[in-house]
């Protein structure tokens, strides 16, 4: 039985699926629909979404199109990269990190317009339904959540197209539109479906939209210097930029040199395995450079603790727990560790590779040439190492005296 909902805020892309959802909400719930379209760097013109919403009967005052690129990078991407977060050893969480912001703004708009419901276009098989809805529960005011893919009987492409045609929804395929299921933002672009559903099948070369093939990348490498303040990149080659500008420029450079392609099978939060291909050129550069500046500015214990908690942090982001107390606790610890992560990193970009050429920090460098030199020095007495080793071996010595063997 459907709940009585008067006004619903829909996460609306302007594409076929969410346009069908918009009409379906009007027909099935007899409710007023408010559309929210976020610009998080997907690289598409968003004004057509306004025209489509108007054509489907949405009031002009109920159409929200907002540029969230700076907020997305500053408050979501950068905090995640301070953690060096990678899911299952490879995935840089480009889709996962975008959902909390959309859910947050949807909940805020619902409060603003007095809506009592929210809706999204995520399917009942994927991770995004979890990410969106955990956000609604964390931030919304007793909102009714409508997930059409879990309710309707439009469970095939043919049925969706028939519904669209019946209701006058434009189903014209855009020129050059990919046949894959794609999701893009300023951090990455993802591809799923079709031949990718066979994990043994290599993706077609023309699938990749952002990056050139590494073998077709320039034969001459490019060297850049990234400046860091408190763990965040703030400049490229000495030029200060905003967070979104930094990521945009690193994307351009990385894509030019064939950097950031990834083909993986991941474990979804709902239990199944999924094959996905990703392009994350700027993020790949940022991760390598951030670890490099940390290598000279972080204390050993702090660095190792960060590495220990990173998989848990990444799992929380992947599974939709961005707003959870535990993620916020970990973030506070991570942000504390970044107070002295200041300096710059020289990076070489060449045919799909990111190579660190150097790292420096004027005020926070813990690398001491005086201590680590292989030449004669006056600050380190090598005899001190003998006692250190004996203390660390004490448990072995005691165990052997008690007859225990280690071979």
UniProtKB/Swiss-Prot annotation:
One of its GO terms (biological process) is urea cycle. Keywords: Amino-acid biosynthesis, Arginine biosynthesis, ATP-binding, Cytoplasm, Ligase, Nucleotide-binding. InterPro entries: Arginosuc_syn_C, Arginosuc_syn_N, Arginosuc_synth, Arginosuc_synth_CS, Arginosuc_synth_type_1_subfam, AS_cat/multimer_dom_body, Rossmann-like_a/b/a_fold. L-aspartate binds at residues 123, 127-128. Its main location: cytoplasm. ATP binds at residues 11-19, 38, 121. Its EC number is 6.3.4.5. This is Argininosuccinate synthase. It comes from Campylobacter concisus (strain 13826). The lineage of its organism: Bacteria, Pseudomonadati, Campylobacterota, Epsilonproteobacteria, Campylobacterales.
């Amino acid at each position: 039985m459907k709940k009585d909902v008067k006004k619903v805020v829909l996460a609306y892309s302007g594409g076929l699926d969410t346009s069908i959802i918009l009409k379906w909400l009007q027909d099935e719930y007899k409710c007023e629909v408010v559309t929210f379209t976020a610009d998080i760097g997907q690289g598409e013109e968003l004004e057509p979404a306004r025209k489509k919403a108007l054509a489907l009967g949405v009031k002009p005052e109920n159409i929200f199109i907002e540029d969230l690129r700076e907020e997305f990078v500053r408050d979501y991407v950068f905090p995640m990269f301070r953690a060096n977060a990678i899911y299952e050893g490879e995935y840089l969480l480009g889709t996962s990190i975008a959902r909390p912001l959309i859910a947050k703004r949807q909940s805020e708009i619902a409060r603003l317009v007095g809506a009592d419901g929210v809706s999204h276009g995520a399917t009942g098989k994927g991770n995004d339904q979890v990410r969106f809805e955990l956000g609604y529960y964390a931030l919304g005011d007793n909102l009714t959540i409508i997930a059409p893919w879990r309710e309707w009987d439009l469970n095939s492409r043919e049925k969706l197209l028939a519904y669209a045609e019946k209701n006058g929804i434009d189903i014209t395929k855009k020129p050059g539109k990919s046949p894959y299921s794609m999701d893009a933002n300023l951090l990455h672009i993802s591809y799923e479906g079709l031949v990718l559903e066979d994990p043994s099948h290599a993706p077609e070369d023309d699938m990749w939209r952002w990056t050139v093939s590494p073998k077709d990348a320039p034969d001459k490498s490019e060297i850049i210097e990234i400046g860091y303040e408190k763990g965040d990149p703030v400049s490229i080659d000495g030029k200060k930029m905003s967070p979104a500008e930094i990521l945009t420029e690193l994307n351009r450079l990385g894509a030019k040199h064939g950097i950031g392609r990834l083909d993986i099978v991941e474990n979804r939060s709902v239990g199944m395995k999924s094959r996905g291909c990703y392009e994350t050129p700027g993020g790949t550069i940022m991760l390598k450079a951030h670890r490099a500046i940390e290598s000279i500015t972080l204390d050993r214990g702090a660095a190792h603790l960060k590495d220990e908690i990173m998989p848990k942090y990444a799992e929380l982001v992947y599974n939709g727990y961005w707003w959870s107390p535990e993620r916020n606790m970990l973030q506070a610890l991570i942000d504390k560790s970044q107070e002295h992560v200041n300096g710059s990193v020289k990076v070489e970009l060449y045919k799909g590779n990111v190579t660190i050429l150097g790292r420096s920090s004027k005020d926070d460098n813990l690398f001491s040439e005086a201590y680590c030199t292989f030449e004669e020095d006056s600050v380190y007495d090598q005899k001190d190492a003998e006692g250190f080793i004996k203390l660390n071996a004490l448990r072995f010595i005691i165990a052997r005296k008690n007859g225990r063997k280690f071979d």
